[in-house]
Design a protein with these regions (language model features):
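Short loop/turn segments that connect beta-strands within beta-propeller blades
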Residues: 72-77, 120-126, 181-185
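Surface loop/turn motifs at the tips and blade-to-blade linkers of beta-strand repeat domains
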Residues: 28-34, 83-89, 130-139, 168-169, ...
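Residue position within the beta-strands of beta-propeller blades
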Residues: 50-54, 103-107, 156-158, 210-213
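Beta-strand-rich domains and repeat architectures in extracellular enzymes and scaffolds
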Residues: 2-13, 23-66
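Beta-rich catalytic cores
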Residues: 36-37, 64, 90-92, 113, ...
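Blade-loop segments of beta-propeller domains
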Residues: 56-57, 63-109, 115, 131-135
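Residue-level detector of Asp-centered blade-edge/turn motifs that repeat once per structural unit
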Residues: 43-47, 98-101, 148-152, 204-206
Length: 231
């Protein structure tokens, strides 16, 4: 493990309570075969493990893929280790969050597999199940990130990056933010003013939801400073 200089930008003094007086960054693990650490970052305190999703890469069969990994964090007496998790059950996984006794992933989907919210067990053999994949019959584009309100509702973003990157069908929905109630199975579009809604999080009192709009860069790699890059 290697220490690097502190690189924390603090905009709220309360953050210092979490950082302590001398925060530092520590490299736990690195992997050079593919970009293994990209999204999710779901930490399970009970097992001291982190579930992450890779960035896209082409596997040995030449297919576009995303790999889910489980990181056992380790401590001073043992190094962090990585285990590749079977990822076929969550097609092109991206953002994730703690949910029940496992992880709720945003799956971007493929030409043949649905984009949607997938629940995956945190224990081997890591079975997964689909919660929702459409808005009143119209398939989601390529779900990106997710957060859960204390009332149990699930909020998530759905940009069209999958289509732009060539692995999802033509979109049938705008770039929108949704609220899903897993009890009633009700689904509502909450916002549709974004170019490419991406990250999502609630304020501590849950009265405000923060959403990043990464419209500045599109899925084909094109960048335009006239497009939003905002929160």
């Amino acid at each position: 493990m290697a220490d690097t200089p502190s690189a924390f930008a603090v905009f709220d003094e309360r953050f210092h309570r979490l950082l302590g007086p001398s925060p530092s960054l520590e490299l736990l693990l690195e992997h050079h075969d593919y970009p293994f650490a990209h999204e999710a970052g779901v930490y399970l305190p009970s097992t001291d493990e982190i579930f992450i999703t890779s960035n896209q890469f082409f596997n040995s069969s030449g297919q576009r893929s995303i790999q889910i990994s489980k990181i056992s964090v380790g401590d001073g007496s043992r190094k962090a280790t990585r285990e590749e998790i079977p990822s076929d059950g969550v097609p092109m996984a991206n953002g994730g969050i703690n949910y029940k006794n496992g992880i709720l992933f945003c799956a971007q989907g493929s030409e043949t597999q649905a984009s949607g919210l997938y629940y995956m067990s945190s224990s081997s053999p890591y079975p997964s199940s689909l919660l929702i994949s459409s808005f009143y019959g119209r398939p989601f584009n390529s779900l990106n990130d997710v957060v859960i309100h204390s009332d149990g509702s699930i909020w998530f973003t759905d940009p069209i990056y999958g289509y732009e990157q060539g692995y999802r069908p033509k979109p049938e929905l705008p770039n929108q933010v949704y609220r899903y109630d897993p009890v009633t199975k009700g689904i509502r579009a909450m916002a549709d003013v974004f170019g490419r809604p991406n990250g999502i999080a609630f304020s501590p009192d849950e009265k405000t939801v923060y959403i990043t709009d990464t419209d500045w860069i599109h899925g084909d790699g094109s960048m335009d400073g006239m497009r939003p890059s905002t929160m």
